[in-house]
């Protein structure tokens, strides 16, 4: 058994910046039509020099910052002191050289594709750089001299259609080989560095990530198996000798003498493995508070040249932990503020400079011009002089001041006596991909842009009626970028390291979808809202969320499947998953049948989860419903559901929360993450506007507090719950749906040729989302306005993996 994880040392906490005034229910005036907060904070630069992220967290990265494009995952230093970085996310991938003195990119080589995996060898100012090609199944070799690089050659590990996906690399000079991890083939491949011929392969654990070597053995982090595979290089061919259990989601590896240091992205910690015994000698927690729930996401490591200090990238905390490696124990000496979601680290040869790749850079921003969210978020590299003890103390205080999470946030935000006493039933309704401006931008009393409201009151009268009757939330942001991570954020307040690092490749058509397959890496067992509710002894029913169905004309032809263990016994089997040929009004009828049955039984589930996916739309598929017809159907279904809930005997003790899983399919003049949030409940305030900064995690936190559940992650723990939008005395007046004012049978022209294959619309977000956005815009503004444009700091279109 591994030793007990050690906590953070006592570090004085600076006062945490409060995003909004904390108000109790009793202190809030119930004034109809009044905005609940006079000030509105939105994502972006703040007066103190920090940046407010759409997640509600703040960053102020140390050092100088260099923009490098989407999702940088690799950093290496060259013998001349410059830094090589790859951007490996959505859109064009590239290999770049950064001059650390001038703090700028001075050379860039476009790549067909890239992902994790970068290594270099060389001396006397001559370097060879090896880069994994991800979906190309190739490894690229670059010659680098005098600041210029050129592609010397490349090696194919397998045919282009094979599932290999080269990832982490390790150079084996004794053997004259380079070892390449095959992330999708669960193997390690060996390439002869002289001939570029393949010299065999060794099977390892599930979804291997990266690898390091001490010359006689090769160590491979098995991302999906909680193990490190040990390959013996002293024999020919090499063989896998053992698999060392280290903990959940092992990612980055660093050798330190006779020890192996492993970043455990799923455990908030770092494991220290004694290679002589094969046992975990120590596990150190690097979270910002002891006993913190998941969320720190340590996913990258770098060792100082003297071997005394380990740097740990904490992607979820937007910081780097500075860990002193003592002979007997590790300890966190302090923290350095990074950008948004740090993903790679490197130390200079003299140990004076730390380089940090920030996967999401310095935030997002508005996309009123329709720029796709995959391009809105661009990564960066921070160039940070290594601080002395006093500087590290200042940085540590800064990290704590920037973070909204603390141990105190694990407790309920208000006392049970301060929240509505009878509120005990929650209905959680999840829809697809709309921004605030697309739907509610036409509401005059909110912060909207009516020019972007293509699904305005004429298309969505029920959403408008709900926002008008209860609360208009005009400052709500989704935590996720796309459906791949959006449903994870919606259902558990966090997206895994695996999810965050693979969805940009999936959405660039460079990797097959596997994020709802029950894969523990993407869908960690026991981590979801329904799991927590079931453990608490609550009654939970799921309608469609995280399920799959086939197209068909009847329920029997659409068997509902789920690979998520916790959903198998609580999912309604005749409720379709993502089948857009099924009207959401049909889903509303099926749900209404269940409500009628519960009413007859005199009981109602504690937690009901409902997926209404049809506002995703089918774009301009010929002879299929138009985007506005599908959104109108979705809106009518929502109105019918809220009406039926309001007629139930459970209504006086019920709250329904309605949100989008992400906001990727439209523009917004405030931020690409701003989206639609609706609340229907007798306890919701009437005719109000709430401009409090809320997130997906805020909704989760509110649900948890209603149901008596602990926070699932650091993000929902830190989030501001929606209590400002609730009142003490209920108004149980029923809600009557509004009939659709848009023809639900409106079809796209039969002659139109969509650029999206029909098969790509059979699963959520399988389609080219940029193209879908373009078609949705053109369906509403045919020839009268320019469609949203693709923008990025690099020129590039989506590429199909070959």
For each feature predicted by the language model, list its residue ranges:
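N-terminal pro-sequences and low-complexity stem/linker regions of secreted or lumenal proteins
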Residues: 394-802
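Predominantly soluble domains enriched in secretory-pathway, periplasmic, or organellar proteins
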Residues: 23, 29, 33-414, 419
């Amino acid at each position: 058994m591994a030793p007990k994880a050690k906590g953070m040392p006592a570090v004085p906490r600076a006062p945490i910046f409060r995003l909004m005034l904390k108000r109790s229910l009793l202190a809030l005036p119930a004034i109809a039509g009044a905005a609940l907060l006079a000030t509105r904070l939105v994502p972006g630069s703040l007066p103190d020099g920090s940046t407010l992220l759409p997640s509600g967290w703040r960053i102020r990265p140390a050092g100088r910052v260099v923009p490098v494009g989407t999702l940088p995952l690799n950093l290496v230093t060259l013998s001349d002191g410059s830094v090589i970085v790859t951007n490996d996310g959505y859109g064009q991938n590239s290999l770049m050289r950064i001059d650390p003195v001038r703090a700028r990119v001075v050379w860039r080589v476009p790549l067909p594709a890239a992902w994790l995996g970068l290594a270099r060898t060389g001396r006397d100012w001559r370097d060879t750089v090896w880069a994994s090609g991800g979906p190309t199944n190739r490894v690229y070799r670059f010659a680098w001299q005098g600041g210029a690089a050129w592609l010397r050659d490349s090696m194919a590990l397998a045919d282009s259609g094979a599932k290999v996906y080269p990832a982490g690399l390790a150079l084996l000079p004794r053997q004259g080989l380079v070892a390449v991890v095959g992330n999708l083939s669960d193997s390690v491949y060996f390439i002869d560095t002289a001939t570029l011929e393949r010299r065999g392969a060794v099977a390892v654990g599930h979804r291997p990530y990266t690898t390091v070597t001490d010359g006689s053995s090769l160590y491979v982090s098995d991302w999906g198996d909680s193990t490190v595979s040990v390959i013996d290089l002293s024999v020919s061919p090499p063989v896998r000798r053992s698999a060392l259990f280290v903990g959940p989601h092992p990612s980055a590896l660093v050798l330190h003498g006779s020890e192996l240091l492993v970043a455990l992205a799923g455990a908030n910690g770092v494991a220290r493995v004694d290679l002589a015994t094969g046992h975990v000698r120590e596990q150190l927690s690097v979270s910002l508070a002891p006993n913190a729930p998941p969320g720190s996401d340590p996913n990258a490591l770098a060792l100082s040249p003297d071997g005394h200090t380990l740097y740990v990238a904490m992607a979820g905390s937007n910081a780097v932990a500075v860990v002193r490696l003592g002979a007997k124990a590790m300890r966190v000496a302090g923290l350095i503020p990074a950008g948004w979601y740090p993903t790679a680290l490197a130390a200079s040869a003299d140990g004076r400079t730390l380089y940090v790749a920030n996967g999401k850079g310095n935030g997002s921003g508005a996309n009123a011009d329709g720029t796709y969210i995959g391009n809105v978020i661009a990564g960066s590299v921070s160039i940070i002089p290594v601080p002395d003890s006093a500087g590290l103390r200042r940085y540590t205080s800064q990290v704590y001041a920037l973070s909204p999470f603390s141990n105190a946030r694990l407790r309920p935000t208000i006392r049970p006596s301060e929240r509505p006493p009878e509120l005990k039933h929650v209905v959680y309704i999840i829809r697809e991909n709309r921004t605030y401006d697309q739907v509610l931008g036409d509401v005059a009393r909110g912060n909207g842009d009516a020019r972007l409201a293509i699904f305005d009151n004429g298309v969505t009268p029920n959403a408008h009626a709900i926002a008008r009757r209860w609360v208009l939330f005009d400052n709500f942001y989704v935590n996720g970028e796309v459906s791949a991570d959006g449903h994870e954020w919606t259902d558990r307040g966090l997206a895994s390291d695996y999810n965050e690092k693979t969805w940009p490749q999936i959405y660039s058509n460079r990797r097959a979808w596997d994020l709802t397959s029950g894969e523990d890496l993407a869908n960690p067992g026991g981590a979801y809202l329904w799991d927590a509710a079931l453990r608490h002894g609550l009654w939970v029913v799921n309608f469609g969320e995280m399920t799959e169905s086939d197209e068909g004309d009847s329920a029997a032809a659409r068997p509902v499947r789920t690979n998520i263990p916790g959903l198998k016994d609580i999912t309604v089997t005749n409720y379709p998953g993502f089948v857009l040929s099924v009207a959401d009004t049909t889903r509303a009828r099926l749900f209404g049948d269940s409500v009628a049955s519960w009413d007859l039984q005199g009981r109602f589930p504690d937690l009901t989860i409902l997926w209404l996916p049809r506002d995703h739309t089918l774009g301009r598929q010929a002879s299929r419903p138009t985007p506005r017809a599908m959104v109108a159907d979705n809106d009518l279904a929502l109105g019918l559901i809220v009406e039926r809930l309001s007629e139930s005997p459970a209504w006086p003790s019920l709250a329904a929360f309605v949100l989008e899983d992400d906001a990727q399919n439209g523009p917004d003049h405030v931020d690409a993450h701003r989206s639609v949030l609706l609340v229907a409940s007798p306890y919701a305030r009437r005719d109000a506007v709430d401009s409090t900064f809320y997130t997906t995690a805020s909704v989760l936190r509110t649900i948890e507090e209603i149901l008596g559940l602990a926070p699932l992650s650091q993000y929902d723990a830190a989030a501001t719950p929606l209590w400002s939008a609730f009142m003490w005395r209920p108004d149980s007046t029923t809600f009557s749906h509004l009939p659709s004012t848009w023809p639900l049978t409106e079809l796209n022209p039969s002659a139109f040729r969509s650029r999206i294959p029909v098969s790509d619309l059979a699963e959520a977000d399988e389609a080219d989302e940029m193209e879908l956005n373009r078609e949705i815009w053109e369906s509403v503004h045919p020839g009268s306005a320019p469609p949203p444009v693709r923008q990025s700091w690099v020129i590039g279109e989506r590429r199909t993996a070959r």
